[in-house]
Amino acid sequence: MLGVAWSERLQEIHLQLMGAVQLEVVRGLLSDRYGLSVDFGSAGILYKETLSAPSMGIGHFEPLRHYAEAHLLVEPGPRGSGVVFGTRCSEDELDRNWQRLILANAMERDHVGVLTGAPLTDVRITLCAGRAHAKHTEGGDFRQATYRAVRQALMCARSRGECVLLEPWYAFELEVPEDKLGRAMSDMTRMGGRFGAPSAGAAPAASDAGAGAGASGGIATLAGEVPASELGDYALEVAAYTGGRGRLSLQLAGYEPCHDADRVIEEAAYDPEADLPNTPDSVFCSHGAGYTVKWQEVPAHAHVADDPSLLRPWRPADAAFFGGE
């Protein structure tokens, strides 16, 4: 299935494709059906970001006649879990309606990381504390406080070296003539891949498919996993050095820590503090005027103190929570 996504930050349409052939098919369809002549930019890797340790974030939004403060804990989750939301906040400290609003606001946004601006994934975001004002709090105030709290948590984690860049990995099965096996193993090692012992000989039984080994008719099979960023047009390279007898099969294996994160981060040149729609800073009020407080200084200005003794058992932000049970 073709993956299509709009990048608001880059103002670009991103396509998730499996190779040059599919790209040409898409180009042809756009021309035949809609009369569009479309140029495609060079392919890029879909990186993601996560955390390696929990990080508490505080967001405060208090321009004149507005008020909201939210404390959200962002902590690492199991690989492949996406972004999970819940609460440990006592209803004695913050009314359930405000808690629902905070978590609804958190769930509506596609949060991005602070290393490259890549999507945030594999984290659990938990509401731990907050405060509203009986007169001045409006719904949009908590939206601003919530976004800033998540962002402030990520910036704190970044300052401690606890942000992790993730990259996609492919599970591969590479069939090559036996006399080209050394070349194939060398290539996969150079790419940072990992693989089991190759096998050559009779064709593998159906039960062995995917076990990482098998061969037939002088064709050896090498199976393992490799970073997607290293593959490029390797399928074409395989066809070239095997005289058309080689075959490379790929399947997405998931995301793992990026093997060359420093290079990717440097090339991205992403400045999280310059990304104003995702600001980590908060807004406080003094003498009738709002003023901005940088993310590093927000905890010292916060109106609510984090008290672990007030936390309740974790509850997911699911249909029962929003339904009033």
Can you say where each PLM-predicted feature lies in the sequence?
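Accessory interaction regions appended to the cores of large information-processing enzymes
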Residues: 1-325
